[in-house]
Swiss-Prot record:
GO-annotated molecular function: aminoacyl-tRNA deacylase activity; ATP binding; leucine-tRNA ligase activity
Predominant location: cytoplasm
BP terms from Gene Ontology: leucyl-tRNA aminoacylation
InterPro entries cross-referenced by the UniProt entry: aa-tRNA-synth_I_CS, aa-tRNA-synth_Ia, Leu-tRNA-ligase, Leu_tRNA-synth_edit, M/V/L/I-tRNA-synth_anticd-bd, Methionyl/Leucyl_tRNA_Synth, Rossmann-like_a/b/a_fold, tRNAsynth_Ia_anticodon-bd
One GO CC term on file: cytosol
The protein, known as: Leucine--tRNA ligase
Locations listed in the record: Cytoplasm
HAMAP family: Leu_tRNA_synth_B
Keyword Nucleus: no
Originating species: Ehrlichia canis (strain Jake)
Motif 'HIGH' region: positions: 34-44
Matching SUPFAM superfamilies: Anticodon-binding domain of a subclass of class I aminoacyl-tRNA synthetases, Nucleotidylyl transferase, ValRS/IleRS/LeuRS editing domain
Gene name in the database record: leuS
Length: 829
């Protein structure tokens, strides 16, 4: 009777094999693949279990499901490990993959392990090197200078996460902003398409689509030509508020705007060269103080007899629009703060109906135009159109659309990544590596103790012959951003070692169900959408969108604990201290994180309770897209449910797999109605990914089954209910379900059995409750047969309401089918 979960789970896992012929697949289920950090955590458990439930359910519906797994295996932690533990990143990564593979299998996930891939394998990244060469041909890849975080001690570029309080994570040196040549992909070529096609993603969360919409950031405005005094040049300025032009008091340009080459004052030139690039404002919500340098350049206002000074500022960037804006302090808060700081004019041109105080903040609402010459008296919308027309008429301005999104910088000065297949030759310039020489692989004999990029420091690897002229040349020593690998892996699963299979991709993509965290909304998910379009343009397949349905699971949270000194404690440490009577501060539930120590070891949970218990808890109570709080009582409750379920079914000795439910007593029919109603509900819940609701329903079914057994309901009806229960719990708690199926004599593996279909006849309600009303006021509820005719229903309602009607005249009787009867009366005068 005892449920030995360890024995059951180990036994069942040996029997599973979820191989799928990808060319025959009908449904593609994919979770965001993990970085092989070494251990699976609770967030992984939730992510992968949600996907596994969907995959198992779809298989049970007779659908050929493709459910692969792989490893996002390049990345900075492997280099950090190489430095800390004196181990090769390849070895560190492989060991972690081996460990995490065992952990994933222990959870009981129905993956097709035959399609397993790792992005650090040359057989994988040789294809993306080929993509890059094709992107070059199609004009989707290019090289230019861009700002990077530069560590002057280690002589290397740092990722943003490696800059801690403005200093390099390893050297402690103050990080500088430098311009270096970097490779870029032209995601901006698809900006309009990426934005517009969000409308067709009707199975994506609205929040994710809104985040992408804002990230792409379409801005419709006007480019205005300002004449620069004394140097016979014009400065193009972009604005989305042309109606405020009469309120302009200065021009703001990026620190690297080409017009600054016209500055002649040596002191100002020195100030510009010393410009603090570390405090650039790249986000409108930034709290970084706004500052500027008067360049000495002056432009002429196009409509007023006044000149505007040109400031070099930290809140305008060259890679957005024209790199120049005009400042209207009265109607833009950023400009207002800048004008206050530098004592610039603040001129109001938009006036609301109520007087406002411009002494504290800018006014950004609607109103009537004043102090604006030919715009006076107009509304804001009218003034915008009138100003655009005037600028066009004078030939000094025109409509323009820009996007906030920038081209994707893919160069990383790191070792553990995919080498960029480029060679630099003094004679031939930039030369792509020949396709026959792909893949360009990483050297294994690298030294991580030296500062700088290990590839750049390697004594031999970067020195090659030019493929064009045969002269001495050097390899590109940068590697791809790791988002490059994760932007196409969903297509790699559809291919072979020979590359992407065009026909299979066209058939199977987009992925039907994609599950992962919302934190990837504007990087991985957007880059993947771009990659589909880029690969389509290059002829690899014809797929616009990578993911049809997106499920963003919530975080797994846990209370935080700290001692009297504020030091964080692990949950087990906190428990022990509380048992000893020591004071422990209990904080609110937050996302599990190593830094706050509010983590629960998944291996410990599986060892103590089993995978099915962990799966059941993580799927219970909370919708998949909401955060879930880890509670010890919850995991204990899930464990007790499984033990009770096991005992109930194993102890029933009248099971009959050839049950006959035709001629059964009325009390048994009542139970069948309940069972089939729950089957219908669970099926609906699974179709709409209401997994927590489905769990609640099958637990309800367990209670009904327990009552049926206790009251000795017809054994055939009980047998049917047992078979149904075992089948519907399988996607959620597959080990115990599979073993129970085996114990009752089920043939073949349970996951191969079809999903139970609810008997529609049993779903028809025999009786319905009808609200009886008089003049719209509720009187009583009438319970009648579901198929009662209207005349009979009318008669019964009138009889029930006769005391209320009294001597009044019945004017009409309205029947709302299966819901209400409203008797309209008129009292006698």
């Amino acid at each position: 009777m005892h449920y030995d979960f360890k024995k059951v789970e180990q036994d069942i896992q040996k029997k599973w094999n979820f191989y799928t012929d990808v060319k025959k697949a009908q449904c593609y289920v994919l979770e965001m693949f993990p970085y092989p950090s070494g251990n699976i955590h609770m967030g992984h458990l939730r992510n992968y279990t949600i996907g596994d439930v969907i995959a198992r359910y779809k298989r049970a519906c007779g659908i050929n499901v493709f459910h692969p797994i792989g490893w996002d295996a390049f990345g900075l932690p492997a280099e950090n490990a190489a430095l800390s533990y004196n181990i090769n990143p390849q070895t560190w990564t492989k060991n972690n993959i081996d460990n995490m593979r065992c952990q994933l299998k222990s959870i009981g996930l129905s993956y097709d392990w035959n399609k397993e891939l790792a992005t650090c394998d040359a057989d994988y990244y040789k294809h993306e090197q080929a993509f890059f060469l094709d992107f070059l041909k199609c004009g989707l890849a290019y090289r230019k200078e861009s700002l990077v975080n530069w560590d002057p001690i280690d002589q290397t570029v740092l990722a943003n996460e490696q800059v801690i309080d403005g200093k390099g994570w390893r050297s402690g040196a103050v990080v500088e902003k430098r311009k270096l040549s970097q490779w870029f992909l032209k995601i901006t070529d698809f900006a309009e398409e990426l934005l517009n096609d969000l409308k067709v993603l009707d199975k994506w969360p609205e929040k994710v689509k809104l985040m992408q919409e804002r990230w792409i950031g379409r801005s419709e405005g006007v480019v205005v030509d300002f004449e620069i005094l004394n140097i016979n040049k014009t400065l193009q300025v972009f604005t989305t508020c042309p109606h405020t032009l009469f309120g302009a008091s200065f021009i703001a340009v990026s620190f690297d705007h080409p017009i600054l080459q016209c500055v002649s004052d040596s002191d100002i030139i020195q100030q510009i060269n010393d410009f603090d690039k570390n405090n650039l404002i790249t986000d409108a919500s930034s709290t970084v103080e706004k500052f500027g340098i008067n360049s000495g350049l002056v432009v002429k206002h196009p409509f007023l007899c006044m000149n505007l000074p040109v400031y070099v500022v930290n809140f305008v960037l060259m890679d957005y629009a024209t790199g120049a804006v005009f400042g209207c302090p009265a109607h833009d808060q950023r400009d207002f703060e800048f004008a206050k700081k530098y004592n610039l004019q603040i001129k109001q041109v938009v006036f609301p109906e109520i007087d406002i105080d411009l002494g504290k903040e800018a006014y950004v609402g609607s109103g009537t135009m004043k102090n604006s010459d030919f715009l006076d008296g107009m509304t804001v919308d009218e003034a915008k159109e009138a100003m655009i027309a005037k600028l066009q008429l004078l030939g000094i301005g025109d409509k323009m659309t820009y996007y906030r999104i920038h081209d994707w910088g893919i160069s990383r000065q790191r070792y553990w990544g995919c080498p960029i297949p480029i060679i630099y030759c003094e004679k031939c310039g930039t030369v792509p590596v020949s396709r026959k020489d792909l893949p360009v692989t990483l050297p294994q004999d690298v030294d991580f103790t030296k500062s700088g990029n290990p590839l750049d420091n390697h004594p031999t690897w970067k020195y090659v012959k030019c493929p064009s002229c045969g002269m001495d040349a050097e390899r590109e020593t940068d590697t791809f951003d790791t988002f490059f690998e994760s932007s196409w892996y969903f297509a790699a699963f559809c291919g072979t070692s020979s590359g992407i299979d065009k026909d299979t991709c066209n058939m199977l993509l987009p992925v039907d169900y994609y599950i992962g965290g919302i934190e990837h909304a504007v990087l991985h998910l957007l880059y993947s959408r771009f990659f589909c379009r880029a690969l389509t343009k290059c002829g690899y397949f014809n797929v616009k969108e990578p993911f049809s349905s997106l499920i963003t699971q919530g975080m797994v949270c846990h209370a935080t604990y700290s001692d009297a000194q504020g030091n964080y404690l692990f949950p087990e440490e906190a428990r022990k201290m509380m048992e000893e009577g020591q004071h422990v501060n209990v904080g609110r539930a937050e996302k599990m994180s190593k830094s706050k120590k509010n983590v629960v070891n998944l291996e410990y949970i599986i060892d103590k309770y089993g995978a099915d218990t962990a799966r059941l808890f993580i799927l219970s109570d909370t919708p998949p897209d909401r955060d879930i709080e880890w509670l010890d009582d919850g995991i204990e409750g899930a464990s007790k449910y499984l033990s009770k379920l096991w005992r109930m079914i194993v102890s029933y000795d009248q099971i009959n797999l050839n049950f006959n439910v035709e001629d059964i007593p009325e009390d048994a029919i009542k139970y069948r109605r309940c069972v089939h109603k729950i089957v219908s509900d669970i099926t609906s819940d699974l179709e709409f990914c209401r997994l927590n609701c489905a769990v609640a329903k099958f637990r309800e079914l367990s209670n009904i089954l327990s009552e049926m057994i206790r009251t000795s309901v017809n054994s055939d009806v009980v047998s049917e209910a047992i078979c149904i229960l075992i089948r519907v719990i399988e996607p959620f708690i597959p080990h115990i379900a599979e073993k129970l199926w085996e114990n009752i004599g089920g043939k073949d593996m349970l996951w191969n059995q079809m999903w139970p279909k609810a008997d529609t006849e049993l779903l028809i309600e025999r009786n319905v409750n009808i609200a009886v009303q008089v003049n719209g006021k509720f009187i009583r509820t009438l319970t009648v047969a579901n198929n009662i005719d209207n005349d009979q229903l009318k008669s019964m309602a009138l009889e029930m309401a006769k005391n209320k009607i009294g001597n009044s005249v019945v004017k009409n009787v309205y029947i709302i089918p299966k819901r209400a009867v409203n008797i309209v009366i008129e009292k006698l005068s």
